[in-house]
Amino acid sequence: MKARTAGFPGVEVATLLAPGHDDLTGPFWTAWPAEPLLLIALIAAAGLYGLGCYRLHRVVGARAVSSSRATAFFAGIITVALALLSPIAVYSERLFFMHMIQHLLLLLIAPPLLLLGRPLVPSLWGLPAQWRVVLGQLLVPGRPLARLGYLITTPLVAVAAFVITIAVWHLPVFYDVAQGRTFMHDLEHLLFVGTALLYWWPVIHPTGGQRRLSYARALPYLLPPFLESMLIGVLLTFADRPLYRTYVDVAMPWGFTAVTDQQLGGLIMWIPGGLFFLIPLIGLLMALLRQEDARAPGSPPTASRQPTS
């Protein structure tokens, strides 16, 4: 498909309304996808959050939303844009390893950043007052919507949804179907982001209050996707033939073959993908050991100190 010009000299905008781009002869940074609806949605989400932060600041003061949380949320929005609205999205249709980079951004980077911003309250405050009241009532604990939200963010449900989603969409039959049909590809990305938000929810706990995952429970919670990422990465890295038909008969840029491209994609999923779980696992293990040391007989009674008034 011919690339379209967006009115900027030297910048090509590849249309993603149908699969397959033939114009990848220019520099990497010149291939930009045309996704106006997604761009509008991301701008709207950022604007809603920003407006809510402003209103909360006027009502509550500087304590409403910290700058670090706001920065995390906007970084999450930028990460989604980087995955879906940058040359990465265009080149992911030709290069498997680019698609794996896109998946890492959507699964392991953007969702935690969005949740670290604690987006629920600021986003509600970004809405008109009438809408805020209606949605606030729906989210009152005990209401059906609140119960559903509690159910789907329970650790067992969240980790199962996350692991199954990753496994299914990396099976060759589903992967090739998604790459060949725009609707299925969009559905894949939607499920990636949605289940990733569910998965990271119990870890980050963006609503405050009592945590649902202790350090001891968080360790086994992080293991299934860590092992899954390692396994899929190893299988892709050491496969001696292309596993996905999508990349067999396409002209690959930069001198890649289907096998070398797949091997690099496997390494990306194996090593960087594994590190995104391994680093939190090590951090949780160290925190758990410190917690156990504090409980050991003869340890300093720091936990019993009372705050001064």
Kindly give the residue locations of the regions a language model identified.
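Alpha-helical membrane segments of multi-pass proteins
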Residues: 2-309
